[in-house]
Amino acid sequence: MSPQTETKASVGFKAGVKDYKLNYYTPDYVTKDTDILAAFRVSPQPGVPPEEAG
């Protein structure tokens, strides 16, 4: 196993996991003629919140 090295993140980048539901909906998004609508049915595994399953 190789030794660990310290990596410095650039300014403005925060490591970590963001809550998914904060990132997938953008209410001020303006649609374009080239946008494509796609729909998928997702069934979460037991214990997984529906918004995290997608």
UniProtKB/Swiss-Prot annotation:
Keywords: Acetylation, Calvin cycle, Carbon dioxide fixation, Chloroplast, Lyase, Methylation, Monooxygenase, Oxidoreductase, Photorespiration, Photosynthesis, Plastid. It is found in: Plastid, Chloroplast. GO terms for biological process: photorespiration; reductive pentose-phosphate cycle. Its EC number is 4.1.1.39. It comes from the Eukaryota. The modification N-acetylproline is found at P3. One of its GO terms (molecular function) is ribulose-bisphosphate carboxylase activity. The modification N6,N6,N6-trimethyllysine is found at K14. It catalyses: 2 (2R)-3-phosphoglycerate + 2 H(+) = D-ribulose 1,5-bisphosphate + CO2 + H2O; D-ribulose 1,5-bisphosphate + O2 = 2-phosphoglycolate + (2R)-3-phosphoglycerate + 2 H(+). It is an enzyme of class 4 (lyase). Its main location: plastid. Residues 1-2 form a propeptide. GO terms for cellular component: chloroplast. Pfam families: RuBisCO_large_N (PF02788). Transmembrane segments: none annotated. RuBisCO catalyzes two reactions: the carboxylation of D-ribulose 1,5-bisphosphate, the primary event in carbon dioxide fixation, as well as the oxidative fragmentation of the pentose substrate in the photorespiration process. Both reactions occur simultaneously and in competition at the same active site. Belongs to the RuBisCO large chain family. Type I subfamily. The basic functional RuBisCO is composed of a large chain homodimer in a 'head-to-tail' conformation. In form I RuBisCO this homodimer is arranged in a barrel-like tetramer with the small subunits forming a tetrameric 'cap' on each end of the 'barrel'. Heterohexadecamer of 8 large chains and 8 small chains. This is Ribulose bisphosphate carboxylase large chain.
